[in-house]
Amino acid sequence: MGDEDVDGKCKNMSACSSTTSYSTKLFLFMVPLVVISGFVFVNIGPKDSTSLLTSLSTTTSHLPPPFLSTAPAPAPSPLLPEILPSLPASSLSTKVESIQGDYNRTIQLNMINVTATSNNVSSTASLEPKKRRVLSNLEKIEFKLQKARASIKAASMDDPVDDPDYVPLGPMYWNAKVFHRSYLEMEKQFKIYVYKEGEPPLFHDGPCKSIYSMEGSFIYEIETDTRFRTNNPDKAHVFYLPFSVVKMVRYVYERNSRDFSPIRNTVKDYINLVGDKYPYWNRSIGADHFILSCHDWGPEASFSHPHLGHNSIRALCNANTSERFKPRKDVSIPEINLRTGSLTGLVGGPSPSSRPILAFFAGGVHGPVRPVLLQHWENKDNDIRVHKYLPRGTSYSDMMRNSKFCICPSGYEVASPRIVEALYSGCVPVLINSGYVPPFSDVLNWRSFSVIVSVEDIPNLKTILTSISPRQYLRMYRRVLKVRRHFEVNSPAKRFDVFHMILHSIWVRRLNVKIREV
């Protein structure tokens, strides 16, 4: 009504400009109406606009993040639904949706500005278009990550993508199409900055021919890599702290001293060094930084600095939830014993029909699980071959190749190189442990190609294994042959091998975090 009065006033004033007294009266009559109409516009207009903006944001917030499952537990829709099973819905959804919400708010605010100025022609002519704010490097990174999330989320509804090397298919994957899309997005944009500070042997070095070979293998591959490594930290998604706990135990720790402080101080000093020299650690409080360790003391070393243990991505062989391993942010990596530094002679084995032994294990009495296994099965059954020491002249690798199932109990720590050795040999792994998160569980459905047995069920081991039908065993065997490519060490690295699977797990953890400017 106020707008109609204003238009009427303009017409009357142009028609009767010669009558001064009448114009004066009309002016005095119209001023209050103009004031009232302006008051109404100011109070109603913004309130309606805000309501529209709030409605849009609310709608956006209902979209589930790409890596959070909405399916019931018995039928997960993983990569990334089952990927972080312990992640609270609120923490992940807030981080992911805030990105989409910020982007939608920018669009909506621009629409409101255009609508408001179009209602007033005279003021529109005097307004200059607003300059777009230049995004920072971090904001550009986060915007591209948001697009990657959307692409990955949509993958489950799309057709499989052709790939010249390998197309993930089958029940070995929680969601093969989502994993493949995520892997391709990683190849497209993932960048890692390796801090150059530090000298060998404690930094930029690691063992390549031992049970801890993943430390040295990863350091070598990432430092010689040209696809994922960047020399520009402003373009990096994550930052690698390239120290080796194995080397610290060898060169810093005083044997039998039980004094962990030299290792703790080395880690703490290194983080303080890069934190003082660069802005990136303090910007995220370590959330976009990662370490990799296969030593039993890796988890303990990570808590040398509180933010490293609590915030950073920790790629660990010793992935034990009872020792503060957190699947929502940490990465379980395989323990691989490369005695010669290569896979020569390690991969391969006969067909199922040429495997006469039902199950096999040989190993020392380490930790709480193995004594129970040996107590019930050592030298007591021809089908379940359990030995503390192998008989003279018997080959360990030949026993694995001649067995249908390979028993992989935890020792002092939950991880065991036997798991990968079983996969290499074409032997279905039997995992017996407590609190262990198997490698790449964010992507791989271990129950489809391995047998998981609780410590309490060790006495029933033969019953459990013989209850698996020949047809089901054959399916598991074939899946082992397919999935073992993800555990193979290659130099140079090959797509979908263990190096790239570790990178993918780190990539997924980075996708689940949003870093903001400080």
From Swiss-Prot:
Gene Ontology BP annotations: cell wall organization; protein glycosylation
GO MF annotation terms: glycosyltransferase activity
Pfam families, per the entry: Exostosin_GT47
EC number: 2.4.-.-
TM region positions: 26-46
Glycosylation sites: N104, N113, N120, N282, N320
UniProt-annotated location(s): Golgi apparatus membrane
Highest taxon of source: Eukaryota
Its membrane topology: Single-pass type II membrane protein
Predominant location category: Golgi
CC per GO annotation: Golgi membrane
Gene3D superfamilies assigned: Glycogen Phosphorylase B
Keywords, in A-Z order: Cell wall biogenesis/degradation, Glycoprotein, Glycosyltransferase, Golgi apparatus, Membrane, Signal-anchor, Transferase, Transmembrane, Transmembrane helix
Segments on the Cytoplasmic side according to the record's topology features: 1-25
Positions in the Lumenal compartment: 47-518
Record function comment: May be involved in cell wall biosynthesis.
Family classification: Belongs to the glycosyltransferase 47 family.
Protein name: Probable glycosyltransferase At5g03795
